[in-house]
Amino acid sequence: MKTFTYNNKDITIPKPFDSCFFGSNPLKEMTIHNRFNDEYYQQSATLPAFAVAIYDTIIGSEMSEDYDTMQKGLTWFQKYFTKQYFVLLD
């Protein structure tokens, strides 16, 4: 398992997400837009790159119908990035 310190919190990355590519700067903040935005309703959330990698894995798992991995990712997001979870994944 990998651990990152972000906003003075230690965040553990569980398997299988610990094998994600987190980029050269995993703590770099990125803005992700809700994938269901339209011209009347738009939401976005700021996340560190390591959380964006897990977000991408969740979306990919949903598309490939790997619901076990998807649920593990959703549970992780609910624990560590609750506000962003409700904006992006709920």
Give the positions of each predicted feature:
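Acidic, proline/glycine-rich low-complexity IDRs
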Residues: 81-89
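Short, charged/polar N-terminal "headpieces" of proteins
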Residues: 1-29
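A broad, low-amplitude sensor of folded, mature protein cores
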Residues: 3-8, 66, 72, 90
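Acidic, low-complexity, intrinsically disordered interaction modules
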Residues: 25-79
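Short, isolated positions in well-ordered beta-strands
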Residues: 11-13, 41, 84
